Amino acid sequence: MTYTTIGLILAGFGLGGVGYSLLVRTLVLRLGEGGLAGVGGVLLLLGFGAIAAATDWIVIVPLVVSLGFSFYMLHNTLQTRATEMAPEARGSAVSLFAFCLFLGQAAGVSTVGVAIEWLGYRPVIGLTGVALIALAFWLRARLVHA
């Protein structure tokens, strides 16, 4: 597979994000914050699970778009909550959120790299979906009790 093809497939994640931005108002009204987190987590689990099981790259293309859409369902809920953590220090709260996001991405790349060497791609991709649904359900439970 060429790097151009890989880049085009990965661009689908951004396309999913754009789709989310076009539908966010309707989604928030219908699902609420807890629903966004829960549905986003379920879609992430299904998407990563399907990618882990996929045997042909063409199947992965719509799944990557779906991952972009569902990632932003979860991420946007977390980000919105970050702005409400400390209203008197909103800038600091959002900065802390961004710091944690980028630190998590850096640590995730290192951790996943080692995990792939030990376990292979498919189990690690599947476990990513499991970790994300756990995060989504934890957040959803916190939103329900807030």
Please place each PLM-identified region on the residue numbering.
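Juxtamembrane helix-start elements in MFS-like secondary transporters
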Residues: 2-10, 60, 90-94
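Short hydrophobic/small-residue motifs within alpha-helical transmembrane segments
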Residues: 11-15, 102-103
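Helix-to-loop junctions at the C-terminal end of transmembrane segments
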Residues: 19-33, 116-117
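Membrane-helix boundary and inter-helical linker elements of multi-pass secondary transporters
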Residues: 29-30, 52-53, 84, 116-122
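C-terminal transmembrane helical hairpin of 12-TM major facilitator-type secondary transporters
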Residues: 34-78
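Intracellular helix-loop hinge segments at the cytoplasmic ends of transmembrane helices
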Residues: 72, 76-85, 98
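A late C-terminal transmembrane helix in Major Facilitator Superfamily
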Residues: 84-119, 128
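Multi-pass alpha-helical transporter architecture, strongest
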Residues: 129-146
